Amino acid sequence: MNIAKLLGVISFICWIVACVLTICIDASSVFSQALAQGMCAYLTFVLLSND
């Protein structure tokens, strides 16, 4: 596994962790936070995986 794919996986895992923490801490803002973080993580993961 090369560096780019590794970073993509790490960013994806961080997004999942962030979503879980957001749900536990502040459920009222979970949708807006998950959407913003999810888009960034998903785009990063897809772009880096295309190497």
UniProtKB/Swiss-Prot annotation:
Keyword annotations from UniProtKB, A to Z: Antibiotic resistance, Host membrane, Membrane, Transmembrane, Transmembrane helix
Q: What is its main location?
A: host cell
- One GO CC annotation, please? host cell membrane
Q: Where in the cell is it found?
A: Host membrane
- Report what the protein is called: Uncharacterized protein 52.2
Indicate the transmembrane segments per the record: 6-26, 28-48
Loss of this gene results in the following: Mutations in the gene confer resistance to acridine-inhibition of phage development.
Q: Species lineage, top-down?
A: Viruses, Duplodnaviria, Heunggongvirae, Uroviricota, Caudoviricetes
Residue spans making up a coiled coil are none
Q: Which gene encodes it?
A: ac
One GO BP on record is:
response to antibiotic
At the top level of its lineage, which domain of life is listed? Viruses
Give the membrane topology, semicolon-separated if more than one.
Answer: Multi-pass membrane protein
What is the organism of origin for this protein?
A: Enterobacteria phage T4
